[in-house]
Amino acid sequence: CPNLGIAAHLNIMEGKALTDCPLLTNDEGSFNIGYGYLILNQKKWELLEQIEQEFRAQIEKIKENDVEIDHLDSHVHTHAIPEIFKITCKLAKEYNIKYVRTQYEELYFIPKLLKHLNFSYPMNLVKIALLQYFTLKNRKTLNEYGLKSNDFIIGVGYTGMMDSDAIKYGLKAIEEESIVEALIHPCKYDDATKNSHTKEF
């Protein structure tokens, strides 16, 4: 796919950090924070400084390998948190990256009962509401920086359950002529439950 846009998938949730960021990592330099921690502490200057430093290092690492970055997004939507989104947009502008992902998903339902009889689905509805709220705030930041974004996203409500039906019904709920991102994690296992990213969020 020679024309496929490649994102910098910014990560401060798992794995090893590229920088010294003790507010994000354990003593071994591995990320060990949760989404709630980031929301509650998003106004703390020192934390934001370390996040910017780590995001910058990750962008630079990609650029060192001669990869042109088309857009920015993040692991488990950490950049959606409004104060972190501001950092992301600042870096996008600095590195001439024109697109930053936003996470507004229209609520939709697949007419299959088993899709909803699990512990993940109610939590996914909470995620949708939170990310919708963040996106409404973040669109103002996008405009301030003159950046572009997708109009909608599909895949949050059915995280861990994505299939052709989830995509089909998700697209039906969205206005035509919209830019849409579908969140799909390639599977490693025949047992789809082993590929679930629900716990990460």
Task: Label each residue range with its predicted role.
Residues 1-71, 82-201:
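Terminal accessory/targeting
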Residues 74-76:
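Active-site histidine-anchored catalytic micro-motif
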Residues 78-80:
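Acidic, metal-coordinating catalytic cores used for nucleic-acid/nucleotide bond scission
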